[in-house]
């Protein structure tokens, strides 16, 4: 993709209403408006074009992307890490298989609220995969979201990281949107 095409995509992005996506989590595809979904596709195309043209996509000079997986994963974990790297974020992997991770304090009674705030220090984004139990994954993501919002509001966190659903019990928005963009192209 050439620079002219990239500029045209950026211009078309300006015509979309995606204001609600700023400082907002991305949990479920059906919670987003058509403009927000279209804007997400445009940003993906712009990033692809920049990458193909060997133009840096770094938006961050430093920062963290937290990869919180409560299930096994290869493709999704690697894709999230690659996306964070493309934007200039270092990735910290926090793997908590079904909440019983003996390497964390969860096994010793640490609450979701405590864990969420602890892993959120200096974080810009948290990608969560929790798809093992119906009725649990999406609820867990909302609990984490509420905890980091509370931590930010109360001054525990200097910034509030955005949460991205990397797969839950009711939706896999990153995969759905990647599949749709593949079909579109």
Question: Where do the PLM segments sit?
Answer:
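Phosphate/diphosphate ligand-binding glycine-rich loop within oxidoreductases
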Residues: 58-66, 71-184
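Positively charged, low-complexity intrinsically disordered leader regions
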Residues: 2-78, 82
């Amino acid at each position: 993709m050439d620079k002219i095409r990239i500029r045209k995509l950026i211009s078309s992005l300006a015509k979309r209403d995606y204001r609600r996506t700023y400082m907002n989590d991305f949990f479920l595809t059906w919670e987003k408006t058509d403009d927000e979904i279209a804007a997400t596709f445009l940003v993906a195309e712009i990033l692809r074009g920049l990458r193909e043209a060997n133009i840096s996509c770094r938006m961050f000079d430093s920062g963290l992307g937290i990869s919180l997986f409560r299930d096994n994963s290869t493709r999704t974990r690697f894709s999230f890490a690659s996306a964070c790297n493309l934007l200039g974020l270092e990735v910290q992997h926090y793997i908590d298989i079904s909440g019983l991770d003996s390497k964390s304090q969860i096994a010793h009674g640490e609450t979701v609220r405590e864990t969420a705030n602890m892993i959120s220090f200096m974080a810009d984004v948290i990608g969560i995969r929790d798809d093992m139990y119906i009725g649990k994954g999406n609820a867990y993501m909302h609990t984490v979201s509420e905890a980091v919002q509370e931590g930010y509001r109360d001054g525990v966190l200097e910034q509030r990281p955005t949460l991205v659903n990397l797969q839950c019990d009711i939706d896999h928005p990153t995969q759905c949107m990647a599949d749709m963009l593949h079909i579109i192209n």
